[in-house]
Amino acid sequence: MAPATRSLLRAPLLLLLLLLATSRLATGAPVANELRCQCLQTMTGVHLKNIQSLKVTPPGPHCTQTEVIATLKNGQEACLNPEAPMVQKIVQKMLKSGIRK
């Protein structure tokens, strides 16, 4: 192939790749969601009977704080304050009963 033809074929290919890369951002899809804390605000407690599962994320490179995320029976997720005595009791009860995600 001639060099001029080759560069004419490259331009549409590069444009297509650029469009594909930006379309993911345009749809609002999360990009690298795990690279930051998930809990921006926390609650001091929630009633144990409303919790379906519990996820405890230790501190790491993504977030310097321990995060406790409760999935409620109505499907909502709630960030709980891991320092709150009520939350610590909930975590201990869930660990003992084995209902941990």
UniProtKB/Swiss-Prot annotation:
GO molecular function, a single term: chemokine activity
Record-linked Gene3D superfamilies: 2.40.50.40
Main subcellular location of this protein, as a coarse class: secreted
Highest taxon above the source species: Eukaryota
Keyword Oxidoreductase: no
InterPro entries: Chemokine_b/g/d (IPR039809), Chemokine_CXC (IPR001089), Chemokine_CXC_CS (IPR018048), Chemokine_IL8-like_dom (IPR001811), CXC_Chemokine_domain (IPR033899), Interleukin_8-like_sf (IPR036048)
KW Signal (keyword) present: yes
Keywords in alphabetical order: Cytokine, Disulfide bond, Growth factor, Inflammatory response, Secreted, Signal
Cysteines paired by S-S bonds: C37-C63, C39-C79
GO biological process, one term: inflammatory response
Protein name: Growth-regulated alpha protein
Protein source organism: Cricetulus griseus (Chinese hamster)
Gene: CXCL1
